[in-house]
Amino acid sequence: MSLIVSDRFRIVVGLGKSGMSLVRFLANRGVSFAVADTRENPPELATLRRDYPQVEVRCGELDVDFLCRADELYVSPGLALATPALQQAHARGVKLSGDIELFARYAKAPVIAITGSNAKSTVTTLVGEMAVAAGKRVAVGGNLGTPALDLLSDDVELYVMELSSFQLETTDQLNAEVATVLNISEDHMDRYSGLPAYHLAKHRIFRGARQVVVNRQDALSRPLIGEGLPCWTFGLNKPDFHGFGLLEENGEKYLAFQFENLMPVRELKVRGAHNQANALAALALGHAVGLPFDAMLASLREFTGLEHRCQWLREHDGVHYYNDSKATNVGAALAAIEGLGSDIDGKLVLIAGGDGKGADFSALRAPVAEHCRAAVLLGRDAELIAQALGDAVTLVRVDTVQAAVEQSARLAQRGDAVLLSPACASLDMFKNYEERGRVFAQAVECLS
């Protein structure tokens, strides 16, 4: 149903970045709506009151009777659908939806939809750069950068969207041209009842998809629906007939499609097996929408990675320092430890800790024992990580990132790498993972 011809009333619940994009979208289409937020002073409140003074806004505890005035609630991803007021409104017949559902209704160009526990932003950025290199008018965003509704334009030829599990919870039918779940590992266990619930939320991305891309080495990435859809695969093993992978020739590894070498792995500017997997996933997604190989490979050769994502900072006294502050869950830390650990001559000194979000850290023990010389732990859940690691490596506990860098520099030997890959969120000590990464980078720069 067109929003313009509908006389139904909506409420935007949550006034952050995506909530404000909903406000702009609805206001520009003449839709009748109001706004609610659980916070007394949400981030975009001043902007709303300045630009849309006529819009009713309620801040503080959600009022169920107020919510039930609406036919539909557009719930921001930061607010759990299990929130009692939302559940009560839903039980009384109010539809729960979100910005991605609206985006899907109005997007006219093909959509590449990307989710996963890790590497979403890197792969999304890579595919966007590949599309630009191929001469496409492309819009990139969603959970990364620009909110989805702000990207809508008749001029766009291709959308490349990073989507979180929270965004997908309120998305019934995305209708992507190609969709992928890059990988699945425990994350946000403070919001989900367990891995199965998180898994189901991620897999909503496949609803209505015309093609899928699957990680051959992660069974949880395979669609629960859509048997018979065109399927492309990627993995760090030999490619299958519909897949991208690694081949070896004369002792050199190549990114490959089917049985054809595409480019030597050594030509990638980003290091580690996890970055090879990211490159292969991006190739599969680009190929699914017809991007030419020459443009995609040129983009791969120039890609230097994203800030706070296994980002090389400097070399000091024969030790390399990497900022992987974006590793806010165990799966992301595992990818960095295994990917970088297998790519250097020495050992890693790992810096980890923060808000674990209810995660199980036991999966860290084996790769840390294999690839790390020591682990320097800090933050709220440092002791939980220490218990999981046991006697696998030398453990050092500190109170600040600066102290962690100083201790790591003492522990590391020439040929080693110091890796900040926390396996935790940052909110116990920092505003966000970006601030944590900047503090780490500053501490590394101060080493002398």
Curated annotation (Swiss-Prot):
Q: Which GO terms describe its molecular function?
A: ATP binding; UDP-N-acetylmuramoylalanine-D-glutamate ligase activity
Pathways per UniProt: Cell wall biogenesis; peptidoglycan biosynthesis
Q: Which domain of life is it from?
A: Bacteria
Which residues make up the binding site for ATP?
G116, S117, N118, A119, K120, S121, T122
Q: Which GO terms describe its biological process?
A: cell division; cell wall organization; peptidoglycan biosynthetic process; regulation of cell shape
Q: Return the protein name.
A: UDP-N-acetylmuramoylalanine--D-glutamate ligase
What protein family is recorded? Belongs to the MurCDEF family.
- Gene symbol here is murD
GO cellular component terms listed in the entry, alphabetical order? cytoplasm
Question: What function does the entry list?
Answer: Cell wall formation. Catalyzes the addition of glutamate to the nucleotide precursor UDP-N-acetylmuramoyl-L-alanine (UMA).
Query: Which EC class does it fall in?
Result: ligase
- Keywords in alphabetical order, please: ATP-binding, Cell cycle, Cell division, Cell shape, Cell wall biogenesis/degradation, Cytoplasm, Ligase, Nucleotide-binding, Peptidoglycan synthesis
Q: Which Pfam families match?
A: Mur_ligase_C, Mur_ligase_M, MurD-like_N
Q: What is its EC number?
A: 6.3.2.9
Q: Which reaction does it catalyse?
A: UDP-N-acetyl-alpha-D-muramoyl-L-alanine + D-glutamate + ATP = UDP-N-acetyl-alpha-D-muramoyl-L-alanyl-D-glutamate + ADP + phosphate + H(+)
Q: Where in the cell is it found?
A: Cytoplasm
User: Which InterPro entries has this protein been placed in?
Assistant: Mur-like_cat_sf, Mur_ligase_C, Mur_ligase_C_dom_sf, Mur_ligase_cen, MurD
Is Nucleotide-binding given among the entry's keywords? yes
